[in-house]
Amino acid sequence: MHEQRSLTMNALTPAVSTGPLPASRKIHKSGVLHPQIRVPMREISVHPTAGEPPVIVYDPSGPYTDPTVETSIEKGLARLRHEWITARGDVEAYDGRHVRPEDNGFAVGERLTPEFPVRNRPLRARSGKAVTQLAYARAGIITPEMEFVAIRENLGREMLRGTLQRDGEAFGASIPDLVTPEFVRDEVAHGRAIIPANINHPESEPMIIGRNFLVKINANIGNSAVTSSMAEEVEKMVWAIRWGADTVMDLSTGRNIHNIRDWIVRNAPVPIGTVPLYQALEKVGGIAEDLTWEVYRDTLIEQAEQGVDYFTIHAGVRLHYIPLTVDRVTGIVSRGGSIMAKWCLHHHRESFLYEHFAEVCDICRAYDVSFSLGDGLRPGSIADANDAAQFAELETLGELTKIAWAKDCQVMIEGPGHVPMHKIKANMDKQLAVCGEAPFYTLGPLTTDIAPGYDHITSGIGAAMIGWFGTAMLCYVTPKEHLGLPDRNDVKIGVITYKIAAHAADLAKGHPAAKVRDDALSRARFEFRWEDQFNLSLDPETARSFHDQTLPKEAHKLAHFCSMCGPKFCSMRISHDIRAEAQKEGMAAMAAKYREGGDLYVPAEESGAPLMPEAHELS
């Protein structure tokens, strides 16, 4: 069970969900190259009668599900990577920029969210240094972050190597039986994977995004001009990672953007992404035409100092691509894309994001902020899928990827959007070819436009498919997509839906450890171990509540049936009866074989004895 509690006495401190998931405990595995690292995983125990070991699963929930760790939202999480970062000797602390009124949308008085109580001096690269995981990987250095993610990806499967199965179609991905730190280094060095890990976010537990690793999911949170608060957004972040979000994007667009982000980053054990353009727009009063490179640059530095791990940069929206969207059914649906398109048309020139991209790289290089190159011209309806505007921008994203790589910056590429099923694979194939196998990060895609209120399902279908084809991270869609700002329950539904999609993709790709949890749950289902079924599921609370709606008594959790079929029509119970009967017949047949030969085995068919003796003969 989880509880929601404020971790200090201050009434302004947000209450967050804590406590372990059912039958689960946090375990840690230590490093070999870097013995100081402790990699978290979740161990799910099963009933002793099963005679099976616990199941180990990936766990991005941080200390919030570990009852042995005391957390304080006002203090933030432990800075576990700080010593790793400073030990490399290539960073320096400095005072950083001062927070200005425009950083929080000019909010004052009661409308101003309190500053995060603890302020550490930000770090940046020393002059001439690149402090990115890509730079280290290219230099042949295996960082603690690289060993951390290698251990994390394996999920203890080195203990299961004899039982693992490679069953799937990987479409060119090269998933190893065992992930080594050197394999991680090589994937990062070649740009096929990224480890989003800003040097000013030492609280984060390293994770990796790449098609040769587990498929990851992102959850979006953030306030708007009309709804939500700091307390709600911090709880949404904690709630999202509790259910399996690997990264979280803060897409706040209202007031208090700076202070809300500080509270989120300081308490986030996962990478945090943003769209800096949103805050830059707030700084100029929401007027796109008034945006400047200077305002945007200041916003990048502000967020890099806070510890944002990856930026969505809509630098691929070029002036001559905008006319390609005129005949679309839904035009330009990306907020960032529409802002930059409006700016370009007003000023009759290329965007400042495109013109100053090399300078953006210099900033990201100094803090190890990864690029998430935005798809500002993504299709917003299936009618617009795979059109000239979408693929023209993708070509530019490929060009920008090479520029970023030349600056030692980590890069992933954002993708659509709304794409019918038969057009999905073309998106993956083109992205791999154009962007040099940089990780693909897609929103869905939604496979049909007819289901407002159910777009977590329409997009989950596309997400599972494109994840199978090679997408490295899937951005979740909630039931509120196109309708409103998601609340806490919407966040959970979106995360669970996308955990299903990501896991289905891992299974289809033939990930060597993907089936372990499935098989454990299937055995529990066949053996009517109801509690194990609940606990091994992605959402134990919902599974248990659905079962208990019709069979609420504890005795029902020992029953060999559920309310769907009842005791007489349960297929698995009937299968048990068939298996028992077959076993009985087999024993009777064996007895017949031995009867004629005594201790010396003589096949019954050779002795003339009947294979199935009558019942009175066995009495």
Swiss-Prot record:
Disordered: annotated segments: 1-25
Any one GO molecular function term: zinc ion binding
Assigned GO CC terms: cytosol
Cofactor details (free text): Binds 1 [4Fe-4S] cluster per subunit. The cluster is coordinated with 3 cysteines and an exchangeable S-adenosyl-L-methionine.
Statement: the UniProt record of this protein carries the keyword Repressor: no
Matching Pfam families: ThiC-associated, ThiC_Rad_SAM
Residues the record lists as binding Zn(2+): 418, 482
Gene3D superfamilies cross-referenced by the UniProt entry: 6.10.250.620, Radical SAM ThiC family, central domain (3.20.20.540)
EC number(s) recorded for this UniProt protein: 4.1.99.17
Record field: compositional bias (Polar residues): 1-11
Keyword 4Fe-4S: yes
Protein residues bound to substrate: 220, 249, 278, 314, 334-336, 375-378, 414, 441
Cofactor: [4Fe-4S] cluster
Residues binding [4Fe-4S] cluster, per UniProt: 562, 565, 570
Pathway membership: Cofactor biosynthesis; thiamine diphosphate biosynthesis
UniProt superkingdom: Bacteria
Role: Catalyzes the synthesis of the hydroxymethylpyrimidine phosphate (HMP-P) moiety of thiamine from aminoimidazole ribotide (AIR) in a radical S-adenosyl-L-methionine (SAM)-dependent reaction.
Family recorded in the similarity comment: Belongs to the ThiC family.
NCBIfam families assigned: PRK09284.1 (NF006763), PRK13352.1 (NF009895), thiC (TIGR00190)
Protein's UniProt name: Phosphomethylpyrimidine synthase
Organism: Mesorhizobium japonicum (strain LMG 29417 / CECT 9101 / MAFF 303099) (Mesorhizobium loti (strain MAFF 303099))
Name of the encoding gene: thiC
